[in-house]
From Swiss-Prot:
Subcellular localization, as worded in the UniProt entry: Vacuole membrane; Golgi apparatus membrane
Residue ranges crossing the lipid bilayer per the database entry: 10-30, 42-62, 107-127, 129-149, 155-175, 192-212, 226-246, 263-283, 290-310, 313-333
Protein's name in the database: Uncharacterized transporter C405.03c
UniProt keyword annotations, A-Z: Golgi apparatus, Membrane, Transmembrane, Transmembrane helix, Vacuole
Entry keyword Protein biosynthesis: no
Family: Belongs to the TPT transporter family.
Length: 341
């Protein structure tokens, strides 16, 4: 049983590392879209990306159709066993969530997840990447704090120190890398607003990570396809009026990219989100909200590696130290999580 849990945790870490790579690519694509002065539409980008989740309802429907009879018999057996034994009100049941329960969870997740991604995308339009990255890394503190309150994370001093090391490494890498940036880059238009958006996105990221783990203790407790499919459905049904409102008030234009290249980037970015966020939830359920939050900081030294290859940025001691701190923070949190297993 212990070996099985360790194996599941290891698989979750592998999935997380793959998600980090996908999100890194997505961030570059999103940045390229927002750099287009004729297409500054963070809400539309988030709406399209989230809306793609509705396609998960297709495989869920056919799978549900095949297994409905067997599932109903299993639920009946579980119902009878519960009434034949004592029921502990102090524990949360691990039985699979039904359609209605999953729908309620998907609705709450859709709103918080959409808001987090919208504020994250919007902040890039008002502040510089360095400030955005540093502030976003603070989501680990929100995740640890909220997770401890609702008992999905166990607070330890080593976790706090690992988190501080990771954030410290992020600050070192980002500030050093910013010194090598092109001096011709235009300054941020509204840095205070952009930084506030980034901080709000970090808080919301911690909220939805903890919320999902609190309601779904293991990946077997919910149909992930149904969960994400309903998130996409709620996104398409409930949020489209805001596209028109934002357009009418001049906040952002309701239009697609004007170039073929822009459309291709938009589609590829949505496809990456379609896969990566599904795998992110599975990785989080196999590990912990804090581990996936700290794990996302690994994208920063990875992005630095790409900058060295593609833009000719050079390594120095500070960049190496910062990267090592980020990796060390991830390793310590992962070690703590394995000890809990």
């Amino acid at each position: 049983m212990v070996l099985q849990a360790i194996g599941k945790h290891a698989l979750g870490v592998v999935l997380l590392l793959f998600v980090v790579f996908l999100w890194l690519i997505s961030s570059f694509l999103t940045s390229s879209l927002l750099d287009d002065d004729n297409f500054f539409s963070p809400f539309l980008i988030t709406y399209i990306n989230t809306g793609t989740f509705v396609f998960y309802l297709i495989p869920w429907y056919f799978s549900e159709k095949k297994t409905r009879k067997h599932r109903l018999m299993s639920e009946l057996s579980m119902y009878e066993s519960v009434h034949d034994s004592s029921f502990n009100l102090g524990t949360r049941p691990n039985s699979p969530l039904g359609f209605r329960q999953t729908a309620y969870l998907s609705l709450g997740f859709c709103i918080i997840w959409f808001a987090a991604n919208y504020f994250s995308n919007s902040s890039l339009g008002f502040t510089n990447v360095a400030s955005f990255t540093i502030i976003s890394s603070m989501s680990g503190f929100f995740t640890l704090g909220l997770g401890t309150i609702v008992n999905v994370e166990r607070f330890t001093l080593s976790k706090l120190l690992a988190l501080m090391a990771s954030v410290g490494g992020v600050i070192i890498v980002v500030t050093q890398d910013a010194k090598q940036a092109d001096l011709n880059d235009s300054p941020p238009s509204r840095p205070a607003l952009g930084n506030a958006y980034a901080l709000l996105a970090a808080l919301l990221y911690g909220c939805y990570s903890v919320m999902v783990k609190f309601h779904i203790t293991e990946e077997s407790c919910v149909s992930t396809r149904l969960f994400f499919g309903l998130v996409g459905l709620f996104d398409l049904i409930l949020l489209w009026p805001f596209l028109i409102i934002l357009h009418l008030y001049g906040v952002e234009r309701f239009s697609l990219p004007s170039t073929t290249a822009g459309l291709i980037v938009l589609i590829i970015n949505a496809s990456i989100t379609f896969v990566s966020d599904y795998l992110w939830v599975i990785a989080m359920l196999m590990t912990s909200p804090l581990l996936v939050t700290v794990g996302m900081s690994l994208s920063i030294p990875l992005a630095l590696f790409f900058d060295i290859l593609l833009k000719g940025h050079y390594l120095n001691f500070s960049l190496i130290l910062g990267s090592l701190l980020v990796f060390a923070g991830f390793i310590v949190v992962n070690y703590n999580q394995q000890n809990i297993i």
